[in-house]
Amino acid sequence: MPIIIDKDLPARKVLQEENIFVMTKERAETQDIRALKIAILNLMPTKQETEAQLLRLIGNTPLQLDVHLLHMESHLSRNVAQEHLTSFYKTFRDIENEKFDGLIITGAPVETLSFEEVDYWEELKRIMEYSKTNVTSTLHICWGAQAGLYHHYGVQKYPLKEKMFGVFEHEVREQHVKLLQGFDELFFAPHSRHTEVRENDIRGVKELTLLANSEEAGVHLVIGPEGRQVFALGHSEYSCDTLKQEYERDRQKGLNIDVPKNYFKHDNPNEKPLVRWRSHGNLLFSNWLNYYVYQETPYVL
């Protein structure tokens, strides 16, 4: 089933070339089925790339989705044209009186700061509070997951000696949770972060359930009561070349960055990346949409 997006959104052309079913708002309004309202709070500086990554995954489901892109009003985005934000994005103030079936909060390259040092932290706290009563289920990704765990449950993040960077094997810890329906017992997911949350801290919060972790990369998937909050510390939405682009960017900046682990063939950056997370990435997003959004949301929001 299609996702509904603005006909002029640049990501539309990318998605259509990949045979992802997208639909214009004009066409969708002629149908009698209610689309699921999904908001994406895009905290990444590479907004258009992140749009395509997430729309690619949520568009690969048998559900019609009405997607609303959000950006932070209290933060000046320097890596995206203001025209793009004006044309395709809303702020929290624009939608705070609405209800949504689902919300995705992305990662952000601010993890070395304390949460309170992030210039939009107060606005993000208001959005996370709003999500508790106005959103059926919220999916938090990477730093967005760390922020959600900290705000809702007081779970701290800790600096790593070296960046967790690469594609890592994870083990399913809870076999009978719908979010992991169809998952293999072992699966891969990318990570790209300088901080971590710790398993003992997660297990110390009775409302949280650890679903999957990695011996090397640590905590990956965590779920709150009734699936109202889902936390993914990795980046299952990443495209094939995202880690490569990050690696090359950091090298160009002169940073001391290791080759992403388990990513390039033979761990050689001159060779092609090996994609081993795509199927489980699709499964993660489709399970979230099906079991925690579509199956749980009321017809009238």
UniProtKB/Swiss-Prot annotation:
Its main location: cytoplasm. One of its GO terms (biological process) is L-methionine biosynthetic process from homoserine via O-succinyl-L-homoserine and cystathionine. It comes from Bacillus cereus (strain ZK / E33L). The record marks 111 as: Important for acyl-CoA specificity. Substrate binds at residues 163, 192, 249. The active site is at 142 (acyl-thioester intermediate), 235 (proton acceptor), 237. Its EC number is 2.3.1.31. This is Homoserine O-acetyltransferase. Belongs to the MetA family. GO terms for cellular component: cytoplasm. Keywords: Acyltransferase, Amino-acid biosynthesis, Cytoplasm, Methionine biosynthesis, Transferase. The keyword Transferase applies.
